[in-house]
Amino acid sequence: MNLKNRHFLKLLDFTPEEITAYLDLAAELKDAKKAGREIQRMKGKNIALIFEKTSTRTRCAFEVAARDQGADRTYLEPSASQIGHKESIKDTARVLGRMYDAIEYRGFAQETVEELAKYAGVPVFNGLTNEFHPTQMLADALTMREHSGKPLNQTAFAYVGDARYNMGNSLLILGAKLGMDVRIGAPQSLWPSEGIIAAAHAAAKETGAKITLTENAHEAVKGVGFIHTDVWVSMGEPKEVWQERIDLLKDYRVTPELMAASGNPQVKFMHCLPAFHNRETKVGEWIYETFGLNGVEVTEEVFESPAGIVFDQAENRMHTIKAVMVAALGD
């Protein structure tokens, strides 16, 4: 299967077999790193990392993955990038494409990363946009594969919370593409767009995936092996929306009771992080003082329980991002 020089913009661009090939390569690279026998396949390559949104996991994953594989990288922080401000996306793409072997972009509009890919002449990787988070999806799929004990097409998972943005969109597409039993539990006003839902149903017709969207969180999690969530207020949204969002989503909080509603004593909890699960951050303390919530989308009890596999998930960001880069650029 040829993934050489491929852009990695959204899972809709790939077949189930191609997505599985990325997962297989990630598992192979992970094993090699842990065994101390990793072979550098990207020596002499240069990668530009464009971040219009700040990042911990995505940046670190790209940096470490590139370094492990012998590639050099340039980090363009939010304040340093001229993209779309003093220089058009098209021009930025053509400049960086002359200097670098690949470009990673983390920012706002999906259209921006698509335009970079159109004009760069080198592979472009989507580190996150408002609409999609494809590298996170590979990490999530690898993590579920490691913990499931059965093939992904025999695995059920649910996403509960605000499903309008990149995580809800991407998990719905991931499940559809890989033939999984995927459920979205959210108020209907916070479901993915009609276009995303239609794309998921189209993929499911090809793969045999089962898709459920429901406003009942308990119905969504019944029988699943994994429960995913994300923050209720996204980066850049004003503090004023917190009360409205808490009122809307209070029944979708991942509590021990919701975990138990799965009926599966082995159910696992997943979160792309960062998570508001206690008062140990400035935002977490502000939420507690303002709304009386110790933990928002997930309780501390669930987050810190043996069911929580969020740090396996976070580690797998690096291995799966490495797989994307090696597949595109590796010798």
Curated annotation (Swiss-Prot):
Q: Which GO terms describe its biological process?
A: arginine biosynthetic process via ornithine; citrulline biosynthetic process; L-arginine biosynthetic process
What EC identifiers does the entry list? 2.1.3.3
Which EC class, in a word? transferase
| Intrachain disulfide bonds | none
Keyword Transferase in record? yes
**Per the record, what are the reactions this protein catalyses?**
carbamoyl phosphate + L-ornithine = L-citrulline + phosphate + H(+)
Give the UniProt subcellular location, in the record's own words.
Cytoplasm
InterPro entries membership: Asp/Orn_carbamoyltranf_P-bd, Asp/Orn_carbamoylTrfase, Asp/Orn_carbamoylTrfase_sf, Asp_carbamoyltransf_Asp/Orn-bd, Orn/put_carbamltrans, OTCase_ArgI
This protein's source sits in the domain of life called: Bacteria
Keywords in alphabetical order, please: Amino-acid biosynthesis, Arginine biosynthesis, Cytoplasm, Transferase
Does the record carry Lipid metabolism as a key word? no
**GO cellular component terms given for this protein:** cytoplasm
Physiological role: Reversibly catalyzes the transfer of the carbamoyl group from carbamoyl phosphate (CP) to the N(epsilon) atom of ornithine (ORN) to produce L-citrulline.
Under the heading PANTHER family, the entry gives: ORNITHINE CARBAMOYLTRANSFERASE, ORNITHINE CARBAMOYLTRANSFERASE, MITOCHONDRIAL
UniProt family annotation: Belongs to the aspartate/ornithine carbamoyltransferase superfamily. OTCase family.
Protein's name according to its UniProt entry: Ornithine carbamoyltransferase
- Name the species this protein comes from: Neisseria gonorrhoeae
